[in-house]
């Protein structure tokens, strides 16, 4: 397996280092490695699939320190082989080998990995925002310009114009407004909604190779975006942030 695939996989499920603890599940019949993860504040759920099982059999194991795993992987070459060590049918470590060098990463008991709640029936999404290269680039730059702002706000004015605002406040504030060009027939917003801008930025940057994705918004307070290519499938759910002044 290419080491870059593993690095991209960890970036996508960890949101570039925000989430550390996850469960890896190998599904050999589908040639996939799957993860589900959740942020500490429980405002984002991430479901990421790597479409390459690295020739592993069906196993599950916990990775409790993704940042350390990434640092250890950095000493290896471009091509990596993966092998588990098991004791009493439990994976206790994973060995990554490349060009005469190997690393052993000690896995965690699944009981210490934060559980990710099962998704119930999703509400209908009434707003769809195409994630064009231009929109993504502008949003990432806007978040960089207001690095201390962690909230994005979706609003609709009396004329029906949709905006995404970083730095929104009911009082005078530094803010950046982005016009929203929604998909036809999915351009309604029934109320003002707030989501975590930092998380959305990391979702977008960790999936920057994907095109034609859509950010879907529900007035029920849920946002969803899916990215798919030949190597990965990534689904993220953001929950509304309430009580924003």
Enumerate the language-model features and the residues they cover.
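DNA polymerase sliding clamps and clamp-related checkpoint/processivity subunits
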Residues: 1-17, 22-145, 153-245
């Amino acid at each position: 397996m290419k080491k870059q695939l593993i690095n991209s996989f960890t970036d996508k499920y960890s949101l570039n280092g925000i989430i550390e603890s996850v469960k890896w599940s190998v599904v050999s019949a589908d040639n996939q490695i799957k993860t589900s993860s959740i942020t500490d504040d429980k405002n984002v759920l991430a479901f990421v699939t790597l479409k390459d099982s690295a020739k592993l059999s069906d196993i599950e194991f916990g990775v409790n320190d993704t940042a350390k795993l990434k640092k250890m992987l950095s000493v290896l070459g471009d091509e990596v082989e993966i092998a588990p060590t098991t004791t009493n049918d439990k994976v206790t470590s994973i060995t990554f080998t490349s060009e005469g060098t190997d690393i052993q990463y000690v896995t965690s008991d699944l009981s210490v990995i934060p559980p990710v709640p099962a998704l119930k029936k999703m509400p209908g999404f009434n707003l769809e925002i195409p994630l064009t290269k231009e929109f993504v680039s502008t949003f990432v730059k806007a978040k960089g310009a207001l690095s201390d702002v962690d909230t994005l706000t979706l609003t609709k004015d009396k004329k029906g114009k949709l905006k995404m605002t970083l730095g929104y406040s009911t009082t005078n504030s530094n803010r950046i407004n982005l016009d929203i060009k929604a998909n036809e027939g999915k351009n309604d917003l029934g109320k003002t909604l707030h989501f975590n801008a930092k998380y959305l930025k990391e979702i977008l940057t960790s999936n920057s190779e994907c095109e034609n994705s859509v950010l879907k918004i529900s007035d029920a307070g849920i946002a969803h975006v899916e990215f798919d290519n030949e190597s990965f499938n990534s689904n993220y759910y953001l929950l509304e942030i309430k009580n924003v002044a």
